Amino acid sequence: MSTIEAEKPRTEVSPRLKLVLELGPLMVFFFANSRGDWLASRFPVLAELGGPIFIATGLFMAATATALIVSWIMTRTLPMMPLISGIVVFVFGALTLWLQNDTFIKMKPTIVNTLFGAILLGGLLFGKSLLGYVFHAAFKLDEDGWRKLTIRWGVFFLFLAVLNEIVWRSFSTDFWVAFKVWGTMPITILFTLAQMPLIMKHSQERESAE
């Protein structure tokens, strides 16, 4: 294979497909938990996993693996955040099924969000705005903009970690599963939209246009 062939540009995933890959596993998790008994009656192999939350965990792991595989096939790369999240899903999902203890899958968002928050805020201590490596393809900001956005996202991830702990320890499993889809996602979308003024203010593309 020639050098030119080896360096073919990567295919960018469309925003719609990216949304499906990110939300798809969560929707599978929600559906499988709410319809666990029905799935168990239709597919005996799933019944062997245990109750609805365990069936949901197994299918969540499968859906997450599928999303990562599709992303790799399309782009020949795996984004850092989905990859880390996927690894934690597989580890904590396996523990959940093996020990028949749903505490592990419930703590997965806490671990992932704490890890992301610590990485982002910890990077700033070494003068690195690591969020830039995640969003660099989407937009370009000046150094001060990346620093401020990194702080905000770092704190937000830690907030989500604390929120997850409160919800799963204080409410039922069904409520927690529903909150993952219909609570956490809207909160994240609203937070993302709230960052637009900061992004516009520090956008280098805007400065170039001027």
Swiss-Prot record:
Residue intervals passing through the bilayer: 19-39, 53-73, 78-98, 115-135, 148-168, 175-195
Membrane topology value: Multi-pass membrane protein
Any one of the GO CC terms: plasma membrane
Signal peptide location: none
Localization in the cell: Cell inner membrane
UniProt keyword list: Cell inner membrane, Cell membrane, Membrane, Transmembrane, Transmembrane helix
Protein's UniProt keywords contain Transmembrane helix: yes
Family affiliation: Belongs to the YciB family.
UniProt function note: Plays a role in cell envelope biogenesis, maintenance of cell envelope integrity and membrane homeostasis.
Alphabetized PANTHER family for the sequence: INNER MEMBRANE-SPANNING PROTEIN YCIB, INTRACELLULAR SEPTATION PROTEIN A-RELATED
Protein name: Inner membrane-spanning protein YciB
